[in-house]
Amino acid sequence: YQLFHMHNYTYFDIANGVCHKISLDLSLQRNSIDNPIYTRYGSQFLASVSFTPPYSLIDGKDYSKINDPAERHKLIEYHKWKFQGKMFFPLTPLPQNNGPKRTPVLMTRVEYGFLGYYNRHKISPFESFQMGGDGMSGYTNYDYPTELIALRGYENNSIAGRSDQNATPYAYAYSRLSMELRYP
C-alpha cells in the first residue's frame, strides 16, 4: 500500500488530492555475476510484473465524465511489466591466482518496460517512465511517482520530458539496448 498526498504540488497533474495505490508485485530474478561493483563475467536477468485491482471495471463509474484528476486517480490502477537483462563478457583471459585482477569487459544490456491500463479514460500518470540522465536518484525531479530510466549522454527527464506543452510528459513503454566497454 502506498499513499500519495499532494498539497499545492505544481509539477504533477494532481495539484491537491489524495491517491491510494494497492499493488501486488511479483519478480523472477537470476544473478551469476562475480562481483557487484567491478563485474568481469556473468549475467543478471529480471522479469517483473506489478498490478493493482481493476477498480474501474467493478465500481460502475463513467470515468470519461470525471474531469478532476484527483477524483479520477483517487484509486490508482495499472499493470506494469518489465524485463531487464545484462551479460558481461571478459575480452581477455581472466587472470590467474597471482596475476592482475583486471581485464576489459564488454557489457550488453536489454531492457523493456510497459505500463498498461484497464480503462482508457483512467490511464495512470503514476508508475510511468521517463528516460534520460544519470539515474542516481531513481525518480525524476518533477514527478516523483514516475520511474527514471537512466540513459548516459542525456540530461535527467530529457527524453519523455516536458518539451512540448501539449505532449504528455509520461512514457508508457520503453526499450533500452546498450553495449559498454569497461575496464574495472
What are these regions (language model features)?
Residues 5-184:
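C-terminal outer-membrane beta-barrel translocator/porin domains of Gram-negative envelope proteins
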